[in-house]
Amino acid sequence: MSLESIKYTRGSLEILDQLLLPLQTRYIKVRGVEDGWKVINKMQVRGAPAIAIVGCLSLAVELSPDNESSKKNMRQEIEGKLNYLVSARPTAVNIKLAADELINLANTLCADDSISAEIFKERFIGSIEDMLTKDIHDNKAIGSLGCEAILKNIDGDSPVRVLTHCNTGSLATAGYGTALGVIRSLHATKRLEHVFCTETRPYNQGARLTAYELVHEKIPSTLMVDSMVSALMHTRKIHAVIVGADRVAANGDTANKMGTYQIAIVAKYHDVPFYVAAPLTSIDMSLPYGEKIKIEERPDREMTHIGEHRIAAPGINCWNPSFDVTPASLIAGIITEKGVFAPDHLKSVKXHVTGKKYYNIIHI
C-alpha cells in the first residue's frame, strides 16, 4: 500500500512532515494559507505536484468555515492568497498553473449574478478537491504508459533494472507518483528486477524518501551515492533511467532536481534510455527552452549541515541551486498521462496544454 502524504477532508488538512523521514512519521496540521506557504517553503512537503495540491488545499481549508464575505471580497482574497502561495517555491510550474486557473474560476463565479456567495465558495472548494482526485488518476496513467514504453524496448521477458533520482513517489504527489509510479507499475508486472536510487545530495531526498517508499512497498532496491552513477552503468546493465520534473519547457528541456543533468549525460554515453515522467501540468508551453526556467537557490546551510551538525569547513562559500536543466537532446521520452512523447514532438500535446485547462477545474 502506498504511503499517504496528504490527509484531507473538507475543512481539515494534514501533511506528512518529510523533513523527519525516515526516522519519524509525523503529520502537521495545515490550518490555512500561511501554514501552507511555510510547509512548502521549508520543504516539509515537496515535489511539484504535491506543492500545487497542498497549496490549493490550504486555501480550501481557510475558506471552509462559515463567513459573511461577499463574492467580491472572496475573489480578492483568493487572488492575493494564491499569488502568495506561488512565491513559496518558484521553479515548480504546477502551482502557478493551478493558481491561474483558480483565479480565473473565481473571476467567472464572481461575475455571474445568478451565483450566491455560498454557491461561489462551494463550487470553488469543490474544484480544488477535484484536483486531488485528478492528480492520483493521472499518476496511475503515467505509471502504466511508462511501464509499457520501457518494456517495449526490452527483449523477451527479461527482467528490468532501472535507476531513479530524487523522490517522485507518493510523497511528491497526491499519491502513487510519477517516475516512481512507473517503477511501481513495472514491479506490478513482475518484470522489475531491481531499482537503484541515488541519495540526492544535499537534501537527501533519495536516501530519506525514495528509499523509505521502496522499503515500505518491498520493491527490490539499492541506495547509492550520487557520484556512483557512471560506475553503475559501466559495471551493471541498466535498462532505463526514470526521473520526474519540476518544469518542462516547450522544446522538452527539463528542470529537475540538481544532479539530473549529469545522470542524463552518463546515460547517453552508456546508451541507456533516459525518461522524464511528468503530468501535463509540469509542461510550460510559455517557455520556449530551458534557459528561461527560473532556478530556485536554497540556503547554504542545506549543504554545510546535516541536522544540527556542521559537515563543511566554516567560512567556505556555497552554491546551492535546487535544480538543473537537462537538454531535450538527452531525453528519450517524456511520459505524461496522455502518452509518451519524444521531446521534439511535445508540440503534438499542445492541444492538451494550451487553450485548455490543465486541471479541468472550471465547473460553472
UniProtKB/Swiss-Prot annotation:
Query: Which InterPro entries does the UniProt entry name for this protein?
Result: IF-2B-related, IF-M1Pi, IF_2B-like_C, Initiation_fac_2B_a/b/d, M1Pi_N, NagB/RpiA_transferase-like
**The enzyme's E.C. designation:** 5.3.1.23
Pfam families associated with the record: IF-2B
Where is it chiefly localized? cytoplasm
Subcellular location, in the record's words? Answer: Cytoplasm; Nucleus
Q: Does the record bear rRNA-binding in its keywords?
A: no
Question: Which GO biological-process labels does this protein carry?
Answer: L-methionine salvage from methylthioadenosine
Q: Where is the active site?
A: D246 (proton donor)
Catalyses: 5-(methylsulfanyl)-alpha-D-ribose 1-phosphate = 5-(methylsulfanyl)-D-ribulose 1-phosphate
**For the site Transition state stabilizer, which positions are given?**
C166
**Molecular function in Gene Ontology:** S-methyl-5-thioribose-1-phosphate isomerase activity
One GO term of the cellular component aspect?
cytoplasm
Keywords assigned by UniProt? Amino-acid biosynthesis, Cytoplasm, Isomerase, Methionine biosynthesis, Nucleus
Q: In which pathway does it act?
A: Amino-acid biosynthesis; L-methionine biosynthesis via salvage pathway; L-methionine from S-methyl-5-thio-alpha-D-ribose 1-phosphate: step 1/6
Give the protein's biological function.
Catalyzes the interconversion of methylthioribose-1-phosphate (MTR-1-P) into methylthioribulose-1-phosphate (MTRu-1-P).
Can you tell me which family this protein belongs to? Belongs to the eIF-2B alpha/beta/delta subunits family. MtnA subfamily.
Name recorded for this polypeptide: Methylthioribose-1-phosphate isomerase
